[in-house]
Amino acid sequence: MSKEDKEKTQIIDKDLDLSNAGRGVWLVKVPKYIAQKWEKAPTNMDVGKLRINKTPGQKAQVSLSLTPAVLALDPEEKIPTEHILDVSQVTKQTLGVFSHMAPSDGKENSTTSAAQPDNEKLYMEGRIVQKLECRPIADNCYMKLKLESIRKASEPQRRVQPIDKIVQNFKPVKDHAHNIEYRERKKAEGKKARDDKNAVMDMLFHAFEKHQYYNIKDLVKITNQPISYLKEILKDVCDYNMKNPHKNMWELKKEYRHYKTEEKKEEEHKSGSSDSE
């Protein structure tokens, strides 16, 4: 609730009729099929008979029998007739049953009651002293009802339904856009032709002047040569690294390198490490 709604809300003090506050009331929980029957029943119909059998030194046995009039509301629906009520005392809670009554003697009174909520009367019908849970007797009728409820619960929500006509969610096309784009790109690139070996080697030497290590994909882009033909030339002038940190990369063979200073440092480092050992 927003701040504006709280400001608009009016707190009205009303009198509560407590004349029946001392009356004990039972709170009964019934199965869903009984509640549905009772909702369909008219107000003046007897919906059931309650029997209380009291035995000295034992708990009272309470049973409920539905009347034939209630069962006749929907004859096709077979439900159990006899039920047992399990009784439990309410000791650590204070629960009450309340009702309200607003005057509804025509349209004028209904409008005045809406405009003047003070006309509404509140009653306390009693204090809940016992809770009862209604459960059916396990007879054949109840077993059939239970099996039917289990069957309905196990039915899948989605069902496979055969259709007698074709349902097209998309229009068929001769070719897809990404396939056409791929073929056009391949045509634009053209077929890679083999250049002269010396010309390819010149391109490789020029590339290795910029970087010491290359992977095969970059060299294919630089030379624009078929990968099989390029590998043949690389085997003549380059070494393929099989170990980290430059694994799966190509570098020029020692006889073709121009960075002698770096090689000397590496050799000095290797010789220094061998002397220390």
UniProtKB/Swiss-Prot annotation:
The keyword RNA-binding does not apply. It comes from the Eukaryota. It is found in: Nucleus. Pfam families: TFIIF_beta, TFIIF_beta_N. GO terms for biological process: transcription by RNA polymerase II; transcription elongation by RNA polymerase II; transcription initiation at RNA polymerase II promoter. Disulfide bonds: none annotated. The keyword Transcription regulation applies. Keywords: DNA-binding, Nucleus, Transcription, Transcription regulation. GO terms for cellular component: nucleus; transcription factor TFIIF complex. Gene3D superfamilies: Winged helix-like DNA-binding domain superfamily/Winged helix DNA-binding domain (1.10.10.10). One of its GO terms (molecular function) is TFIIF-class transcription factor complex binding. TFIIF is a general transcription initiation factor that binds to RNA polymerase II and helps to recruit it to the initiation complex in collaboration with TFIIB. Heterodimer of an alpha and a beta subunit. PANTHER family: GENERAL TRANSCRIPTION FACTOR IIF SUBUNIT 2. Belongs to the TFIIF beta subunit family. This is General transcription factor IIF subunit 2.
